[in-house]
């Protein structure tokens, strides 16, 4: 069945639920999980008029490392073989979905797991969600996990 599960994480409730589902699947199948965080600062242009780009990117990287450390702790506690990766440069600015798909392809993932709604702010309304992009771009199976608060 599944040997390699790519898990995209972003620290949202939906992402946390996706992590739980990836653990369940990996436990059942013996799969390895690769937790991936894509650091992308393109939302900043929609949210603030002035910012220090370097400070913002470092803040995003720090947050990504924290999210990956938390995921790693849960994967270790469950006894799952795993790796983590912080991608600092998306395929192109704002192209988180394309970056996730490219990473899944490069790693030969059997399945991509991610939450349906993450931390994307106003940009989601303008450009569509990361999960929709992954589904439309990937030739691999994709498992989308809804958060409990979605309607």
What feature does the model see in each segment?
Residues 3-52, 74-80, 150:
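Small/aliphatic-rich secondary-structure junction motif
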Residues 24, 104-151:
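Gly/Ser-rich helix-loop-strand patches that form or flank binding pockets
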Residues 36, 83-87, 143:
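General small-molecule cofactor/ligand-binding pocket signal
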Residues 73-112, 150-151:
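Structural beta-alpha unit
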